[in-house]
Design a protein with these regions (language model features):
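Register position in tetratricopeptide repeats
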Residues: 15-16, 49-50, 83, 116-117, ...
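Alpha-helical segment of the N-proximal tetratricopeptide repeat
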Residues: 2-38, 42-51
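Helix-start (N-cap) detector for alpha-helical repeat units in TPR-like alpha-solenoids
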Residues: 3, 37-38, 70-72, 104-105, ...
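Canonical tetratricopeptide repeat
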Residues: 42, 76, 109-110, 143, ...
Length: 181
């Protein structure tokens, strides 16, 4: 089995929740190709699923050392830092991911950073701008629905969820949110 096939197997195991075997594969990949970032990336993903944020950061830092132009590495490290409440490190990583390729996931995580930094109004304004600039990104509509719901604005939340449902009728999360309203 070549490197790419092993990597795909590790990612498949990760999706299935078999974290021990996915971690084993990540370590094998690192041993086989220590100059490739993907083995360390897989390790970082596994540790995120296990909520082992420091270990995830360590693995992602190694991945970034090897390949510093992949926005996903910065976004994931930023998310781990957000979980540890290292807010400024998280912000820097999200902004780097955005600078690299305008990562939609990093934009959403930057909204979470703003909320955790007690900048709720700034977060909402930022997300509304994202919706205006990219109205086809269903995840932005969902996140705005979540923010409105948490703010006690059920009617507004419902309109955001309904728009998300028009865009992605099979989205289970949106169906659940609308069913609870």
């Amino acid at each position: 089995m070549n490197f790419e096939d092993k990597l795909e197997e590790g990612l498949s195991l990760l999706r299935e929740g078999d974290y021990d075997h996915a971690l084993d594969i990540s370590r094998r990949l690192q041993n086989e190709q220590p100059d490739y970032a993907d083995g360390f990336h897989l390790e970082g993903l596994v540790f995120q699923k296990l909520n082992q944020w420091e270990k995830s950061i360590d693995a992602l830092e190694k991945a970034i050392e090897l390949e510093n132009e992949r926005s996903g590495f910065y976004n994931l490290r930023g998310f781990a830092n957000l979980q540890l409440e290292n807010l400024e490190k998280a912000r820097e990583d999200f902004e780097k991911a955005i600078d690299l390729d305008d990562s939609p996931a990093a934009h959403r995580n930057l909204v979470l950073y703003k909320i955790m930094s007690d900048k709720g109004n700034e977060a909402i304004t930022y997300l509304l701008d994202r919706i205006r600039n990219n109205p086809k990104d269903v995840e932005n509509w969902i996140l705005m629905g979540d923010l409105m719901q948490r703010a006690g604005q059920s009617a507004k939340a419902k309109t955001y969820y309904q728009q998300a449902q028009k865009m992605d009728p099979e989205n289970e999360y949106v169906k659940e949110q609308l069913a609870e309203m």
